[in-house]
Structure formats: C-alpha cells, structure tokens
C-alpha cells in the first residue's frame, strides 16, 4: 500500500514525522513517499501544488497531509498561496466528503473551555461537503457594481451554489455514517434566508426516505452554532455545506480542549482519502518541538480505517493514544494539573511505546 506523505509548512513536518514513526511501528509494511506541498511546494517549483506532488497523490492509496500556510506568503497572488494546495488536492482527487470527529477524552475534560458536565462523553461527527458552495461557486471576483444603491462603486461578490448530485451524494454519506452510530442525523442550513439552503433541505428530506431507520432533523446554522456551545452532547452526526461546515467544525473542535487532538478525513466516492489534523500550520511555534502530534497520529488511524482497510491497526493506534493520555503525558496545549508536559517527539515516542 502506497501512502503519499505531504508534510507541508510550519509545524507540518514535525507532526507528520511522529505519525510516520507510529505507522512504522505497526506490524505492516507501507510504501511511504514524501513530496513538498504548500509553501514548501512553492519554494520547490513555483506552485503550492507541484505537478509531481499531484501525480504522487493520484497514484497513492491514501494521502497523509500535515498543514500548509505561512505569513511570508501572504503577499502572493491568491492562486500561489500555500492554502491553494489543499483546495487543489480536493478538486483534482474529487474529495467531496469531510469527516471531522470532535471527541472529548475523559482525561482532557478539564481542558475544555466549557464545564465538564457539558462535554464529558462528547462524541460528535461533522460531515462537511467539500466541493461546492460559495467557496467554489462562479462567478466571483471584484468589479464595478452595475446597478443597485452603490452602482458605479467597487464591489466584491461570490456565488453560493449547489447541484442536486452534490447534495445527494453527501446526504448518502452522512446517512450511512449516522446509521453506524446513534441513527440520528442533523442537517444544518439557512433555509429561512437562502434559496441554496432550502434546496439543500428539500434534497435531504427526499434522501431520508431511503433511510427509515435514521432520524433526520434540521437546524439553522446560527442556532446550531449557539447550541454547540450551550448543549453540545445533543448532537451525534451533523451534515452541512462547505462554508457552514468549515465554521462549525472549528467551533466543535474547541469544545474538546484543543484542536491539536482532532483528526480529519476527506474522502472520494471510493473511500480514497486525504488525512490531516484539523489545526493549521502554526508558524509561530514551528521548529520549537512543542506542537501536539496526536491529531496527526489519529488522522493516520482514520487513514488505516477508511482507505486502507486496516481497522484493527487503527484501533491499536487509538487505544495507544488513550493510554498515553491516561499515563499523564501532555503537550502544552492540553496541559492539565499533575500531567507530565512533553514535546512533539516525546509524545510520538510515548504513543509508539504504548503500541
């Protein structure tokens, strides 16, 4: 099995190195091939997603991704910024379904900004559509307004758009995920204001007829954001569009105590996927050896489960992470009283030892 390893920028190389260390500790043989991406890709080829990197990603059975982005690239035109690499990979590999689990581990309940009773036992899965919505809708740009109250003035504009096939395929993915869990699915939209959201809701209701065993409910995105902070354990599986999912999944991540604990998977129709931590490249702490590698290690576990059909090995990694937390090992972002604070490498070593 071939895995494309794309460390990226900032803390990306440090945390990916620990995930690779864990993979190498398993009694499996993987072909791991590394390539530059993001700012590193731009430095190597003049583009954040070099042709050779894209070729490797297409040929691989799965992609293990670190993080991209650095302030020094902010002056580049949008098409050349590091963040375009992840958007390009999603587009070229047709990765349309993003899974973002938000789990509050018992050992970290005191690290959450919410009261322990609100987050103890929290286990949410957010299923986000990745290829449509306002992030990719056309037309978009900056122009002189042709009409309206500010005709003749400069304006920025984007297009929120979804096709029926896009909504149907993410609906099926979400219903199938809910079927394997508590058989509850919440669809989040803004159907009281947006035509696109009403269209989304209508299709969700139609698809639900094929999943009589799954309870479908709906919530407006503003209320969902409030409820995530007020009573998050009411949720199990949430399905939503690209922009709403981007925002809600980041909010949900903070309920757990640290975004440094949360993995993610982006899948195509055949379950080939790109696996990455939910956090960014954190250039402010790059090279200091203090980044939390657990989200990346858990992303590797998701990769084993969803794309490589190695569920037992995924379970082993997840159990090892729980063991390490029970033993009191903590990076700075999840530090708790009485815990043993360690750096990136030591945390990876602890997971390997727990295996």
Curated annotation (Swiss-Prot):
GO terms for molecular function: 3-isopropylmalate dehydrogenase activity; magnesium ion binding; NAD binding. One of its GO terms (biological process) is L-leucine biosynthetic process. Its cofactor is Mg(2+); Mn(2+). SUPFAM superfamilies: Isocitrate/Isopropylmalate dehydrogenase-like. Keywords: Amino-acid biosynthesis, Branched-chain amino acid biosynthesis, Cytoplasm, Leucine biosynthesis, Magnesium, Manganese, Metal-binding, NAD, Oxidoreductase. InterPro entries: IsoCit/isopropylmalate_DH_CS (IPR019818), IsoPropMal-DH-like_dom (IPR024084), Isopropylmalate_DH (IPR004429). NAD(+) binds at residues 280-292. Pathway: Amino-acid biosynthesis; L-leucine biosynthesis; L-leucine from 3-methyl-2-oxobutanoate: step 3/4. Pfam families: Iso_dh. NCBIfam families: leuB. This is 3-isopropylmalate dehydrogenase. It comes from Burkholderia lata (strain ATCC 17760 / DSM 23089 / LMG 22485 / NCIMB 9086 / R18194 / 383). The lineage of its organism: Bacteria, Pseudomonadati, Pseudomonadota, Betaproteobacteria, Burkholderiales. The gene is leuB.
């Amino acid at each position: 099995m071939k895995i494309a390893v794309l460390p990226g920028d900032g803390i990306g190389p440090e945390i990916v190195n620990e995930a690779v260390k864990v993979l190498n500790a398993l009694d499996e043989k993987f072909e791991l091939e590394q390539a530059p991406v993001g700012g590193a890709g731009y430095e190597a080829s003049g583009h954040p997603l070099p042709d050779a990197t894209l070729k490797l990603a297409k040929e691989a059975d799965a992609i293990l991704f670190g993080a991209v982005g650095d302030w020094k690239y902010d002056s580049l035109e949008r098409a050349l910024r590091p963040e375009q690499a992840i958007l390009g990979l999603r587009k070229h590999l047709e990765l349309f379904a993003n899974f973002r689990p938000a789990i509050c581990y018992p050992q970290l309940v005191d690290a959450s900004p919410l009261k322990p009773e609100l987050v103890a036992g929290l286990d949410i899965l957010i299923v986000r559509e990745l290829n449509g919505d306002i992030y990719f809708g056309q037309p978009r740009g900056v122009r002189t307004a042709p009409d309206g109250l500010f005709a003749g003035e400069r304006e920025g504009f984007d297009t929120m758009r979804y096709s029926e096939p896009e909504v149907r395929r993410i609906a099926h993915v979400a219903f199938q995920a809910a079927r394997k869990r508590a058989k509850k699915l919440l669809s989040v939209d803004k159907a009281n204001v947006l035509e696109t959201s009403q269209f989304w809701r209508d299709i969700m209701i139609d698809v639900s007829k094929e999943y009589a065993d799954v309870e479908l409910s709906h919530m407006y995105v503003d209320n969902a954001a409030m409820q995530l902070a007020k009573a998050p354990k009411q949720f199990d599986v949430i399905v939503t569009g690209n922009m709403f999912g981007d925002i809600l999944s980041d909010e949900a991540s903070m309920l757990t105590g640290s975004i440094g604990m949360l993995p993610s998977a982006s899948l195509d129709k055949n379950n080939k996927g790109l696996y990455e931590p939910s956090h960014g490249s954190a250039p402010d702490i790059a090279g200091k050896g203090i980044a939390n590698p657990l989200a990346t290690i858990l992303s590797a576990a998701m990769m084993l489960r969803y794309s490589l059909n190695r569920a037992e090995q995924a379970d082993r990694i997840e159990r090892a992470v729980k063991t390490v937390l029970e033993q009191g090992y903590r990076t700075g972002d999840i530090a708790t009283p009485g815990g043993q604070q360690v750096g990136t490498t030591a945390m990876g070593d602890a997971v390997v030892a727990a295996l």
